[in-house]
């Protein structure tokens, strides 16, 4: 489905759309591990990837209604790990803040800043994320009207309430709003189901699912960069 003008707002996913998230999370885990080794060595030893996965599964089984809240999951996971290792559980909040701060140390894709600068002069931009990246801490706040997060809304994509909240924040109708994201199900199809237009950003350095019909174009056009998407939106004045 082609993008229909006029557009009034663009909503953007964050992780794996504006930056690759895996290197960020790996670095944040390493920063947290170093902090734990200094302050809760027993937890640092026991807090292996396998232990984290087991605790995460336990938390999701106990509190499925909190599955959307990555910050709660991480904080509670740390608290449980500290208790199991015999370290003070009140270190959980400080440990979480260490992880959260490191999680904001992202490496933007090269096309992000020039395109955001341009789009922010034409459209209202709203971030839409299931994670706990913070646009102000990352330095992108000036380009955005605001951010809709699963933690704040109480649900996660593909729930249409995420997209409707973004449109409300932008003050636009869904039909005049374009959502941009890397995940075909959570971004493209979910946005279309919520009444928004959608564009699929398929970064070449990431693996992307193949839609059931073999292509995205029935739901949304696909692009390999924000530059390519911008050139499609504004064919007479593409970015250089």
Segments (PLM) and residue ranges:
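N-terminal helical cap/lid subdomain that shapes the substrate entry/recognition surface
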Residues: 3-110
